[in-house]
Amino acid sequence: MRIDELFWNDENVGHLWSAHQVTPDEIEEIIFGVEGEEPTYRIRRDGDFYCISGETGSGRLLNMVGELLENNRFRVFGARDMNQKELRAYRRGK
């Protein structure tokens, strides 16, 4: 799966912050990488949705859920810090 652009609106930005204090910038760092580095996220499909795990430029480890839209745009529904089980699985798969 290729992601060229992230879809943001007031609803998903507000939910990310109010529920888990995650910013759009953190999501973009995971998907597109930080300057001079390639992104290193893991992705898996769960029905119509995708679960993406990755690390921000500051080292925060997040899981996010969203859907692929037309033209390789991706809408994030939610994101949160990884729990211990997810963290172990992410580190094993890197």
Q: Which residues are covered by each model-predicted region?
A:
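Ribonuclease/tRNase effector modules and their secretory precursors
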Residues: 1-94
